Amino acid sequence: MNKVNFQSEGETLVGNLFLPTSNIQDEKLPAVVVGGSWITVKEQMANLYAERLAEQGFAALAFDFRGYGESSGEPRQYESAKNKTQDFKNALTFLQSQPMVDPDRIGGLAICASAGYMARAVAGDGRFKSFVTIAGWFQHPDTTPESYGGAEGVRRRVDLANAAMNKFRSSGQMDYVPAYDPNNENAAMFFEVDYYADPKRGAIPQWENQFAVASWSEWLQLNGIDGVAEKITVPVLFIHSDNSALPDNVRRFHRLVKGSKDLYWSSEGTQTDYYDQEPYVGKAAQIAAVHFRNTLA
């Protein structure tokens, strides 16, 4: 694994570039940009999948989005679909500049919320040649209120977000709540999620259990399906399960994609099982590698 950095709209993003150990000298590699769940850092699920893809012969880049982990950017822990979409595009630009990478054979793999962000990048940037989502979370106005206390819960959080952003712009100070706290209804994740509670899983030292309140505005008003799925023309593979997040939204996105598409559906595994648990990660990574091998040839 090589520690790398690159620029994204004036910010320095820090990443881990995983390479195959058996690469033939001077052979140009297919490459994959990898993104994890919302409010996470590269050392969580992104690193894990990038390492697995490298074992399968790909150059794979996991990185911290602006405002997260080792990357620069303010406010910290600010969840922005717009920013993350652009960061994915700039990660691809970085991979294209690497001498061991074939600049015309680069795809994207996204876990959870990154699926919606990366989909926007893939739809708007023809340099992405293939796309895989794993336990993808595709936000849509029809379903968002179900997770946040209905329309009133959404409005309340958006109002808080707008006030927090106005405060940040005038004072440079951001309001924060916990990213995860099942005992705090104001937390970003106010329900039980073992992954973020367990130091052996997601509650690692590199991860800040913090959420910029201003994030609610973009997150809760995001439509990650309509006007996005229809624009994707590269081969897409959706890996999902009955017990992963928003299964009907994944099916909806899949239906709207007009190009080559595949859906691998399992009756086993929860959303967070696909973050770091076996056999789910191993199986998903293997299926993704086959897809990339066939579509980045």
Task: Describe these PLM feature segments.
Residues 119-199:
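Alpha/beta-hydrolase-fold enzymes
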